[in-house]
Amino acid sequence: MASSLYRQLISQNYYSTGNEILLDQQTNKTTVDYVDAGNYTYAQLPPTTWGAESTYESAFSAPEITGPYTNTVIKLSDLSDSNVWVLYQKPTSTVKLLKNGPESYSWNLAAFELWYGKANTTVTSDYYSGMTNSEKSVEVDHDSLVLFWNEGSTALSNKVINFSWNVGGVLIKLTSNTRIDICMANMDNFTSDSFNWEEWTHNFPRSASMNIYTDYYLASVDPYSQIRALQQPIITTVEMKMVKVKREGSINVDEVVSKDSLWQEVRYVRDITLQCKIESEVVKGGGWGYDYTSVAFKTINHTYSYTRAGEAVNAHVTISFNNLKERSYGGSLPTDFKIGRFDIIDVDTYMYIDYWDDSEIFKNMVYVRDLRADMGGFNYSSAMSYYFRIPVGQYPGLHSSGVRFTYERSLLSQQFTDQVALNSMRFVFRATSSDGWFMTAGNINARRIASGTGFAYSDGYVTETVGTVSFISLIPSNPNYQTPIASSSTVRMDLERKINDLRNDFNELASSVALGDILSLAMSPLTFANLLESVPAIASSVKDVAANVMKKFKTTKMFKKAAKPKYKEYIIGDLLEDVTNLPRSTTAMDFDDITSAVMVSTTNRLQLTDVETLSEIVARSADDFIPNRAYRMIEDGMVHEATPNGVFSYDLATLQQRNFDMEKFMQLASKSPVISAIVDFATLKAMRDTYGVSTDIMYKLVASDAPTIVSFINNNNPLIRNRIEGLLRQCRI
C-alpha cells in the first residue's frame, strides 16, 4: 500500500555527506566576533514623556457606563436600574435615535420617537409621517434632540432641546411596571459642577421594548462628570505644542548624544502609526460535517503605509496573543453540531504587536538603550459573524462585536518578513473590556444557544492608533558603515515563510483531488521513487534529494517511535502512535495509505522548486495529517477499539457494546494485527441500520478492506463517501 513510502523512509538510511556538511554550515554554525568599540561615554538625558497630538477618548472610565452597544432593541425588563441614561456620541448628520410604541401609528396608542437634528435642518418624524399634523416636522437652528410624541388620543406634540455636547442623551425613569418617564434638558455648556437632567419630564405608558437605530451607551449613574471630562481634550494639544516649541524642531528628531572617532550615540524620536489586524482561522474536523475542530486567532503578518513628517513609511507588524481563554460547544457526534475549541480574548489577554518600518531608525538598530514609548490604546469594534456550514438545517453563527486594549509597555524584539530577519519593537497591549460573544442557532437574530464574556471571532478587521517612540542607538560615526541586520536571515524562518505561502495552495489542491483518484493511489505501492517523480522541477540529484528528505524525516514523531525498542506490552497512548511497524493485512487500508497518497498527489500538482520545502511537506504529512486516529483489533468476533477519547469493545455481529478488558487489550496489542479504523463505529452502525449490511460485508468494513471500501465509493454510498471525505479534509498543512 501507499504507506510503504513512510516505511521505506524509516527502514532505509539515505545520506549524502557533502550535502549535510553544507547544510550544517549554513544553518547551525555560530561565529562570535568581538569588536572594541573604543572609549565613549553615555549622556543620560532627563526623562521625557512624548505625546501624539490630541487624542479623544471614546471610552468612559466609569464601570457604571457601558457600551457602545450595537443591538437594535432594548428590552426594558432587562434594565436592572430604575434610572437609566441613554447616551449618544453626537452624530454628524440628522438621524433617528430611538422609538417606543407600536410598529405603526395608531391614534389611540401612545408612542414617542427621538431624533438628532443637525443645525439649520428640518427634522421630520418617520413614525408620524402619515399624519397631516404640522407637529410632525421641526426646523432646528442648533444641534438638537427632538422628541415627537402622542399619548392615547392626545394630539401629536414635540419637544426640542439643544445638544451642544460631544456626548449626551436622555434620562429614562422606570416608574412602574406599566409607566416610564422621559426626562430631557438643554445640553449647552459645562459651567456648573452638576446638571439637572429633568428640565422637562413626561410620563408615558411602558412598552416591552424600545427600538434603537444607532450605537449607544447606557449609564446607571449620573454621567455628567464623565461627559464633562471627555469634552476637554484641548489640554493634550496645548501640552504637545509646548513640547514642540521647547525642542525647537519637528517631533521626528535625530540627535547626536555622544561621539568619538569610531562610534556615536544617536537619539531617535518618531511618531508612529500602529495598525491592529485580528483574524480567526476556522478548522473543520472530519466525520459527517457537523464537527469543527477549532476557531483560533492566527498570528498575523500585516503591512501598511502612512506618511510621517512628509516621509512615506512602509510598515510591517506581526500580531500575536498570550493568555487566551478556551471554550468548547456541542453535543455528541455524529449529527450534533460541535466545536472542539475556540479561543476567547478576555480581560488580561495580552496582544503583542511587533513593529518595523523601512525608515532610517531601523537600519542600525543593533545596540539600543533608553527605549521609551507613549502609545494610545485600541478600540477594536466591529460587528463580526461566522456561520458554520453544517450539512442540514440552519447554519449556527458565532458573533463578536468589540474588545478594547490598553497599552502596557514596549521592548525590543525580532520578527521575520519576506525571508528577512529584522530587529523591531514590540508593543504590549492588555485587553481591559469587551462587549461579549454569543452563538445563535441561525442568523444573528435567531435564538441564542450560548454566550459569554470576551471576544471570540474576527474577520480581519483593521483598526489603528498613534503614538511616539524614542531610543538611543549606537551606530558607526562613519555613515558608510552599515550593520547587516537588514539582510540577515535564517534558513528555518525562510522555510516557515515558504510553507505559509504554500499552505493555501496546497490545501486547496488537496481538497480538489477526486476521491477515486486518491483511493486508487492509496492502493498502489508508493515508494520514494514515486515521490521524486512528483516533483520534476527540483534540479538536485536524486542522492541529494533523498539525503535532505531523510534528514528531515528523522525528526518526525513517526520515525522516533519506530526507531525505539519495542516493549512486550503497550500502553494505549503509545499504541495510537506505534502502529507503523505492526503486522497487517495486505488488502487492508490504513491511515498512512491515505495521507501519503494525498501528499504525493498534491505535491505533484504544486510543482515544487526546492528540496527543503519538499522535505518539510513529507515530514508534516507523516505527523500532522489525520490527527484524530482510531485503531482496532479483532478476535473471535469481538472488536476492541482505541480512540483519542477512550477505549471500548463491541460484538461484530450485533454491534452491541461489551465490557472492555484492559488486560486482554494489552495482550492483543503486542501480538495481534492492528487495523486502522478507516470506517469508524458511527458509520458502521449507520450502515447496518440504514442498509442492513450482511455480517461478511460488515467484517470487511471493520477490517478496513480496501476493495470493499472502494466498491462502496464507486456505488456512491453516501455514508462511506462522507467518512472518507472527512478523513481527506484532515490532510492539511
Curated annotation (Swiss-Prot):
Q: Which Pfam families match?
A: Rota_VP4_MID, VP4_helical
Q: What is the protein name stated in its UniProt record? A: Outer capsid protein VP4
Gene Ontology terms: biological process: permeabilization of host organelle membrane involved in viral entry into host cell; virion attachment to host cell
Positions the record marks as coiled coil are 492-512
What's this protein's family per the entry? Belongs to the rotavirus VP4 family.
Where is the site Cleavage? Answer: 228-229, 244-245
Q: Does the keyword Coiled coil apply?
A: yes
Q: Which UniProt keywords apply?
A: Capsid protein, Coiled coil, Hemagglutinin, Host cell membrane, Host endoplasmic reticulum, Host membrane, Host-virus interaction, Membrane, Outer capsid protein, Viral attachment to host cell, Viral penetration into host cytoplasm, Viral penetration via permeabilization of host membrane, Virion, Virus entry into host cell
GO cellular component assignments: host cell endoplasmic reticulum-Golgi intermediate compartment; host cell plasma membrane; host cell rough endoplasmic reticulum; membrane; viral outer capsid
InterPro entries for the chain = Rota_A_VP4 (IPR042546), Rota_VP4_MID (IPR035330), Rota_VP4_MID_sf (IPR038017), VP4_helical (IPR035329)
State the source organism's domain of life: Viruses
Q: Keyword Nucleotidyltransferase: yes or no?
A: no
